[in-house]
Amino acid sequence: VQTCALPIWSGGGTVRRVEVSTDGGRSWKDARLQEPILRLAHVRFRFDWFWDGAETVIQSRCTDDQGETQLSVMELYKAWGYTEYKSLDKSRAIHFNAIQPWRIAKDGSVTDAMFA
């Protein structure tokens, strides 16, 4: 699996670590960062993963040079003072950089697991 990590969620920093979860966030493994690694810039990373064909949720998170780790959507909602998903002002959805989960179905199709 190859993708991009966006450091902008930190508000100002350089990505130093990217972790990937292939089990819905229960466990995390380090990905390999690719050069160039620049401040406030997209950083490509690689993560070798063999998909066994079972439905799963895959997601990545990054940590910057200040030690700030990207929040899950629930951690972000709590920081904003929301107690449950239904109370979230959906117009704010474009203004956050929470961990983005992606659902991979048995047929290989990929859908947004956060807002779908």
Question: How should each PLM-predicted stretch be described?
Answer:
Residues 1-6:
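Short, small-residue-biased leader/transition segments that mark boundaries at the very start
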Residues 9-116:
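Long, low-complexity serine/threonine/glycine- and acidic-rich segments characteristic of extracellular
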